[in-house]
């Protein structure tokens, strides 16, 4: 087992009655008193010197130490003096003892740090003017603050050959100071043992031993944790300096997790995307698709309205002409002749505006691309389609049953939580579905959905495991609900969850049943009353079809009458735009203030980082203008007014960064028994089986050259996308 952080390693362990190892919190009366530069502070036993110093606001320099990684203690930059101790100690690895007086700025501490810094700089190249880490480099900052003012090293510096670890991370290994943060991240957080050290002493190198790609959906995070410029972003190389960019706090919409991000822009262009701390969602990590797919925001964009001419070709036109044509069709056709499909990247403001517009023409055929069973309780109960336990709540669970999902590629940050709990809390995981690499061990129960019946009836051995669990979770992937027996699968999972609550020691507040969504718009659409799936449109093909960012290919021209008038509103010329008669260019998530609801039901906002390209406009504004031209004006003119309308329809949509607990009623399970559908024998196979299936899943990532390089590198090897080095 990996070495866990010192603080956790020293927590008292106790055996539960059932033999499980549990951690016990330290009582307040057991706190010990230590002194930091003469200032008293009370800390728990096992607290390190560095943590005690931080508690009183004293920052200790460090390179190898990271709060979310195990303690390595190999950079020695955090050396401090302990009063009456013979030698300085490494603050990150030394637990405090009662009565210690820690001297952080004594002559001995300063001299020790100067010596360590001198050794670190002895072989470090003077690359600062051409290094992408310049301006946000820990080595720059700490050498300025804690280092000497001159160098005594006159010999030649060592040089290390760079490693090719894929199309995302650029390596300049001569700059590496062997802090091993990247190695520990790879093995502990990402769960991929691709990185390690070879050699010793002055010959030590960090790399992959044999040349291979760093195969992880979280690989870009090693760029952030690298304290020097040894690991930088290949797509961002030599494009901008940190002080030249404007930072905008926003959220990611590439999956349904809703990771918090910072969008860095310059001169109206997105230069890079970085993670933003949110302990309850993504902590401080983001997936590679979130980080690197931003170049897709400037490719294949729809920048002007377009209409199909008499020759069947799409030609540019004015907003007035395009909206007038659409308005004419809405005035001609009413009721069931008008329908709409919402795509995976659509915000809540656009969803409610489109809903209001179609209601004005007496139509309620508003559908989502993703299917969700409506039989039984269906979408009437919010708890039926949410990750009720929450993402952070995974760390409290003791047993997790995954059904028909591959969270590693469907929701990488949710999977990282599962791994974290498995690593530190002895979480037991089981999977029903295709055997996949989840980066942690699990019990594979099989791939047949009929196993759910056995678990529900109590005849399966895993039923006993769930029964004995204190806080079990059943996580059903939304991809499993796209099947013809989706309603039966949902009913079976609901039955399992209800029986666990009745027979085990689950408390009233703990939610057992969870749905893991894959797309960012699904929860908000269901909250607003959209019908999941396009079956209603296939059964009753409309005369006018409005595709709002619908690029999933769930419906084609062949599914519709030849005279069906199709409007596509979105930001990329992907799957939906080519079949449209009118194209209305919309804004992407970095170009608008918009509301999205993640898989746990948490509403969050994107913020405007750049302006939309060309004549593109925000989606709700386009729909509002269309309603006015069609003579059915919607009653809102500003973003605040649209959000007031959102609050009228579903109040939780404007309670930002708050989760409204969804009650799971027993009636939901009773209604699920009315589902008249049988489980199929077909195996549960998630659509994103391997990392190759992870990179290009929506209109933005499909337009990204960086994501295309990743797919090529995975299938053909990292050498297939290797570019000549400039530096």
Swiss-Prot record:
Function per UniProt: Core subunit of the mitochondrial membrane respiratory chain NADH dehydrogenase (Complex I) which catalyzes electron transfer from NADH through the respiratory chain, using ubiquinone as an electron acceptor. Essential for catalysing the entry and efficient transfer of electrons within complex I. Plays a key role in the assembly and stability of complex I and participates in the association of complex I with ubiquinol-cytochrome reductase complex (Complex III) to form supercomplexes.
Its subunit composition reads:
Core subunit of respiratory chain NADH dehydrogenase (Complex I) which is composed of 45 different subunits. This is the largest subunit of complex I and it is a component of the iron-sulfur (IP) fragment of the enzyme. Complex I associates with ubiquinol-cytochrome reductase complex (Complex III) to form supercomplexes. Interacts with MDM2 and AKAP1.
Gene Ontology CC, one term: mitochondrion
**The 4Fe-4S Mo/W bis-MGD-type domain covers which part of the protein?**
245-301
This chain's source organism reads Pan troglodytes (Chimpanzee)
Q: Which Gene3D superfamilies match?
A: 3.10.20.740, 3.30.200.210, 3.30.70.20, 3.40.50.740
Classification lineage = Eukaryota, Metazoa, Chordata, Craniata, Vertebrata
Binding positions ([4Fe-4S] cluster 2): 176, 179, 182, 226
Q: What is this protein called?
A: NADH-ubiquinone oxidoreductase 75 kDa subunit, mitochondrial
InterPro entries per UniProt: 2Fe-2S_ferredoxin-like_sf, 2Fe-2S_ferredoxin-type, Mopterin_OxRdtase, Mopterin_OxRdtase_4Fe-4S_dom, NADH_UbQ_OxRdtase_75kDa_su_CS, NADH_UbQ_OxRdtase_ferredoxin, NADH_UbQ_OxRdtase_Gsu, NADH_UbQ_OxRdtase_Gsu_4Fe4S-bd
């Amino acid at each position: 087992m990996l070495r866990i952080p010192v603080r956790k390693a020293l927590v008292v362990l106790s055996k539960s009655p059932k033999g499980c190892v549990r951690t016990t919190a330290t009582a307040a009366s057991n706190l010990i008193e230590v002194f930091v530069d003469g200032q008293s502070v009370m800390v728990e036993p096992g607290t390190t010197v560095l943590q005690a110093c931080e508690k009183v606001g004293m920052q200790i320099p460090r390179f190898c130490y990271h709060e979310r990684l195990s303690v390595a203690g190999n950079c020695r930059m955090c050396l401090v003096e302990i009063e009456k101790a013979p030698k300085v100690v490494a603050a990150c690895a030394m637990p405090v003892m009662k009565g210690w007086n820690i001297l952080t700025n004594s002559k001995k501490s300063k001299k020790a740090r100067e010596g360590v810094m001198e050794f670190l700089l002895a072989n470090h190249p003077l690359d600062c003017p051409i290094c992408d880490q310049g301006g946000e480099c820990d080595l720059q900052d700490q050498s300025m603050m804690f280092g000497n003012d001159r160098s005594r090293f006159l010999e030649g510096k060592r040089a290390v050959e760079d490693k090719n670890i894929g199309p995302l991370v650029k390596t300049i290994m001569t700059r590496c100071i062997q802090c091993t943060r990247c190695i520990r991240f790879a093995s502990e957080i990402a769960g991929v043992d691709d990185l390690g050290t070879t050699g010793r002493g002055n010959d030590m190198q960090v790399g992959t031993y044999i040349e291979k790609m760093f195969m992880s959906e979280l690989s870009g995070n090693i760029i952030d944790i690298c304290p020097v410029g040894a690991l930088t972003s290949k797509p961002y190389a030599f494009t901008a300096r940190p002080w030249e960019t404007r930072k905008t706090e926003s959220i990611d919409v590439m999956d349904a997790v809703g990771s918090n991000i910072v969008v860095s822009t310059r001169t109206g262009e997105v230069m890079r995307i970085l993670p933003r701390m949110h302990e309850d969602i993504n902590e401080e990590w983001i997936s590679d698709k979130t980080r690197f797919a931003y170049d897709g925001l400037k490719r294949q964009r729809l920048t002007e309205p377009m209409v199909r001419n008499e020759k069947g070709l799409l030609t540019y036109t004015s907003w007035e002409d395009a909206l007038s044509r659409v308005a004419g069709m809405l005035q001609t056709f009413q009721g069931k002749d008008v329908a709409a499909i919402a795509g995976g990247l659509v915000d809540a403001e656009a969803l409610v505006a489109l809903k209001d517009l179609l209601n004005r023409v007496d139509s309620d055929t508003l559908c989502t691309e993703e299917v969700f069973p409506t039989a039984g309780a269906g979408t009437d109960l919010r708890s039926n389609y949410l990750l009720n336990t929450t993402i952070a709540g995974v760390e409290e669970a003791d047993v997790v049953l995954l059904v028909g999902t591959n969270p590693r590629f469907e929701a990488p940050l949710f999977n990282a939580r599962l791994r974290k709990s498995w690593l530190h809390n002895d979480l037991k995981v089981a999977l029903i579905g295709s055997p996949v690499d989840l980066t942690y061990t699990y019990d594979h129960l099989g791939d047949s959905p009929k196993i759910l019946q056995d678990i529900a009836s109590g005849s399966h051995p895993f039923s006993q495991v769930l029964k004995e669990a204190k806080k079990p979770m059943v996580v059903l992937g939304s991809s499993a609900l796209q099947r013809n027996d989706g309603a039966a699968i949902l009913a079976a999972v609901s039955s399992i969850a209800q029986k666990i609550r009745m027979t085990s020691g689950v408390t009233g507040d703990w939610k057992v049943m969870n749905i893991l969504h894959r797309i960012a718009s699904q929860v908000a659409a269901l909250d607003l009353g959209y019908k999941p799936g396009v079956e209603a449109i296939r059964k009753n093909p409309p005369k006018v079809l409005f595709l709002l960012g619908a690029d999933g290919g769930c419906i084609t021209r062949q599914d519709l009458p030849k005279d069906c008038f199709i409007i596509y509103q979105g930001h990329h010329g992907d799957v939906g735009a080519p079949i449209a008669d009118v194209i209305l260019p919309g804004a992407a998530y970095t170009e608008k203030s918009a509301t999205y609801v993640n898989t746990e039901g948490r509403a969050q906002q994107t913020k405007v980082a750049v302006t939309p390209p060309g004549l593109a406009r925000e989606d709700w504004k386009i729909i509002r203008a269309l309603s006015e031209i069609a003579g059915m004006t919607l009653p809102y003119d500003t973003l605040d007014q649209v959000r007031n309308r959102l609050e009228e329809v579903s109040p939780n949509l404007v309670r930002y960064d708050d989760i409204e607990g969804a009650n799971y009623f027993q009636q939901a399970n009773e209604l699920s028994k009315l589902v008249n559908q049988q489980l199929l024998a077909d195996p549960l196979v998630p659509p994103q089986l391997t990392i190759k299936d992870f990179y290009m899943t929506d209109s933005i990532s499909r337009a990204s050259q960086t994501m295309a390089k990743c797919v090529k590198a995975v299938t053909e090897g990292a050498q297939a996308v290797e570019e000549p080095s400039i530096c």
